[in-house]
Amino acid sequence: MRKWLYRLFIELTNHSLSSKLLASFAKSRLSGLLISSYAKIYHINQDEMEKSLKNYKTLQQLFVRRLKAGVRPVDADEHTVVSPVDAVIEDMGTIRENCEMIVKGKPYSIAEMLGSVEAAQPYVNGFFFILYLSPSHYHRIHSPISGVIEKQWALGRKSYPVNRLGLKYGRRPLEKNYRLITEVTAGGKRLAIVKIGAMFVNSIELTHEGEQLVKGEEMAYFSFGSTVVLLFERGSFAPDPRIVAPMPIKVGERLGYWCEAHER
């Protein structure tokens, strides 16, 4: 019953008109009246922000704020993989033979997420992370490794909540939501960075130019809280034993080790 009521509410409120209205409001000067309250409610760390709160004129500007230089140091070990976002690690684990990952006890198909069995095949028996960004988090996305962008594509249209309730009761949001997928190679292995849109707001903006990525370098931003899924090819990654789910993590902090370092 709870699942049915949750889905009914989401379907009744999640349509193109409400999405456009919310996006328009967030970009309007009127939304600026809510900035102070928003910062207090979500406990935004103003000491880290590039600008003072009074310099943000709309909620949209606050959502996509940049941070001061140096407040997110990137793990210096050249063999490490770092978090691309400030987030909560909601889940992590091994991708099964049938292309499924288990998130909050619920199976999700990476073939659906990536758009085909062919695209998913390299990640079978690999590793995954689910990184959830709440409205309070810094919304910019950075590269978790240094490598080369091999392919980039978008899937999905609508977006549903990707918070804990969404993962538990929703209609498979990690597979169905609007998502922008970036596939990166390094040392002959690949990593998929799946940026998933949040309810109402599908906007995922790319900021990186060129094919070469440097670990810790900005590559995109969300216009609202959302989720990043990392998919590692089999044999390419070893998680840091200190990492557990759920736990908070910040941009540049170590998630684990790329294959070449682990093999040594």
Curated annotation (Swiss-Prot):
Pathway: Phospholipid metabolism; phosphatidylethanolamine biosynthesis; phosphatidylethanolamine from CDP-diacylglycerol: step 2/2. The modification Pyruvic acid (Ser) is found at S226. Pfam families: PS_Dcarbxylase. Binds 1 pyruvoyl group covalently per subunit. Its EC number is 4.1.1.65. It catalyses: a 1,2-diacyl-sn-glycero-3-phospho-L-serine + H(+) = a 1,2-diacyl-sn-glycero-3-phosphoethanolamine + CO2. GO terms for cellular component: plasma membrane. It is a peripheral membrane protein. Keywords: Cell membrane, Decarboxylase, Lipid biosynthesis, Lipid metabolism, Lyase, Membrane, Phospholipid biosynthesis, Phospholipid metabolism, Pyruvate, Zymogen. InterPro entries: PS_Dcarbxylase, PSD-B, PSD_type1_pro. It is an enzyme of class 4 (lyase). GO terms for biological process: phosphatidylethanolamine biosynthetic process. Its cofactor is pyruvate. Is synthesized initially as an inactive proenzyme. Formation of the active enzyme involves a self-maturation process in which the active site pyruvoyl group is generated from an internal serine residue via an autocatalytic post-translational modification. Two non-identical subunits are generated from the proenzyme in this reaction, and the pyruvate is formed at the N-terminus of the alpha chain, which is derived from the carboxyl end of the proenzyme. Its main location: membrane. The record marks G225, S226 as: Cleavage (non-hydrolytic). It is found in: Cell membrane. The active site is at D86 (charge relay system), H142 (charge relay system), S226 (charge relay system), S226 (schiff-base intermediate with substrate). GO terms for molecular function: phosphatidylserine decarboxylase activity. Heterodimer of a large membrane-associated beta subunit and a small pyruvoyl-containing alpha subunit. PANTHER family: PHOSPHATIDYLSERINE DECARBOXYLASE, PHOSPHATIDYLSERINE DECARBOXYLASE PROENZYME, MITOCHONDRIAL. Catalyzes the formation of phosphatidylethanolamine (PtdEtn) from phosphatidylserine (PtdSer). Belongs to the phosphatidylserine decarboxylase family. PSD-B subfamily. Prokaryotic type I sub-subfamily. HAMAP family: PS_decarb_PSD_B_type1 (MF_00662). This is Phosphatidylserine decarboxylase proenzyme. It comes from Geobacillus kaustophilus (strain HTA426). The lineage of its organism: Bacteria, Bacillati, Bacillota, Bacilli, Bacillales.
